[in-house]
Amino acid sequence: MYKLVLIRHGESTWNKENRFTGWVDVDLTEQGRNEAYQAGELLKEAGYTFDIAYTSVLKRAIRTLWHVQDKMDLMYLPVVHSWRLNERHYGALSGLNKAETAAKFGDEQVLVWRRSYDTPPPALEPTDERAPFNDPRYAKVPREQLPLTECLKDTVARVLPLWNESIAPAVRAGKQVLIAAHGNSLRALIKYLDGISDSDIVGLNIPNGVPLVYELDENLKPIKHYYLGDQEAIAQAQAAVAKQGKAG
């Protein structure tokens, strides 16, 4: 049996402001930093250790990983930073308040943009300052692979090559792997691991800063998964994530 630990970054400044973030590189709030430290404490108390970690190239995930490593005294851990673990790109919605967007376009439309599998938000113009083409962190990524918007289906297609070529081989080699990433890049991976249908994935909400443990068989198929921590508080956090895109 193998174990894999996933963690969504702690609360970011735009999570707090209920804004669509995507590839915009916002930082953690004080609460987000505390969530990351608490995650590290939970993992340490439960006896976990790691051989390698994976994260995105966005600072909210990177700092979350730092705080977990710090709490676990694992600052020396090898870390792979990959754009493939970035949050889903929200296109022209990037920076907009979710509730205000729902008031303008309707809860149903925003739910489709946020949670449907194959409907992306409106795309950015290539000349938009939010487009990734001139960002130095993507200088080595072929331009045609850089998105101007994404649906979850696109995010799955972006994440899976990293899983197949790097993460899964590390797990099979017996390495203890930690992934610190984002709500939708983790939803993409979980959809693949658990075989969740395109329609059911709408209902999957991942709370900030809570370790999610997957126990996998020899074929890397999930045996079970569970969050570490106060289960009632985790359920409340998941419900709060689900409500973010509503006008009320």
Swiss-Prot record:
Pathway: Carbohydrate degradation; glycolysis; pyruvate from D-glyceraldehyde 3-phosphate: step 3/5
Xref: PROSITE patterns: PG_MUTASE
Alphabetized UniProt keyword annotations: Gluconeogenesis, Glycolysis, Isomerase
Statement: the UniProt record of this protein carries the keyword Cytoplasm: no
Reaction(s) catalysed (UniProt annotation): (2R)-2-phosphoglycerate = (2R)-3-phosphoglycerate
Site (Transition state stabilizer): H182
Molecular function terms from GO: phosphoglycerate mutase activity
One GO term (biological process): glycolytic process
InterPro entries listed in its UniProt record: His_Pase_superF_clade-1, His_PPase_superfam, PG/BPGM_mutase_AS, Phosphogly_mut1
Residue numbers annotated as active site: H9 (tele-phosphohistidine intermediate), E87 (proton donor/acceptor)
Top enzyme category: isomerase
Source organism superkingdom: Bacteria
SUPFAM superfamilies hit by this protein: Phosphoglycerate mutase-like (SSF53254)
Binding site for substrate: 8-15, 21-22, 60, 87-90, 98, 114-115, 183-184
Gene3D superfamilies xrefs: Phosphoglycerate mutase-like (3.40.50.1240)
EC number: 5.4.2.11
NCBIfam families on file: pgm_1 (TIGR01258), PRK14115.1 (NF010713)
Family: Belongs to the phosphoglycerate mutase family. BPG-dependent PGAM subfamily.
Function description: Catalyzes the interconversion of 2-phosphoglycerate and 3-phosphoglycerate.
HAMAP family from the UniProt entry: PGAM_GpmA
Assembly notes: Homodimer.
Stated name of the protein: 2,3-bisphosphoglycerate-dependent phosphoglycerate mutase
